[in-house]
Amino acid sequence: MANHDPISDMLTRIRNASEKRHEKTKVPASRMSLSIAKVLQSEGFIAEINEEGEGFRKQLILGLKYTGKHRSPIIRSMQRVSKPGLRIYKNTRGLPKVLGGLGIAIISTSNGVMSDRDARKQGVGGEVLCYVC
């Protein structure tokens, strides 16, 4: 069965794995999923990114982060914003602040995929892919 929204699939896999307290999760690799994973890693939501396999069977192995004695997940929620059927674009001034700056919005811009903070610093807008907090 074909996956029509690989970004939603990636977010769902990460969300499910973190709720079940898994150490790692596998995600089908693509340039977009790698870019999103790098943003999540730079913002401190995931620990590591490794690649496995070759060609169309290539997968990303994402190491998830937890905090405290009871291993509560760092990622509390992930929400897809722009979907294949309804794209959401924002200019620099319209970029959202997630939980008053505690979370991030991942934005696809002409300069690449980045967090909302980086997009504001660079003065670019783009497609709002998802919210993470």
Swiss-Prot record:
Keywords: Ribonucleoprotein, Ribosomal protein, RNA-binding, rRNA-binding
Protein name: Small ribosomal subunit protein uS8
Complex and partners: Part of the 30S ribosomal subunit. Contacts proteins S5 and S12.
Disordered: annotated span: 1-28
A Pfam short name: Ribosomal_S8
Name of encoding gene: rpsH
Domain of life: Bacteria
GO process annotations (BP): translation
Record-linked Gene3D superfamilies: 3.30.1370.30, 3.30.1490.10
PANTHER family for this protein: 40S RIBOSOMAL PROTEIN S15A (PTHR11758)
Basic and acidic residues: bias regions: 16-26
Family: Belongs to the universal ribosomal protein uS8 family.
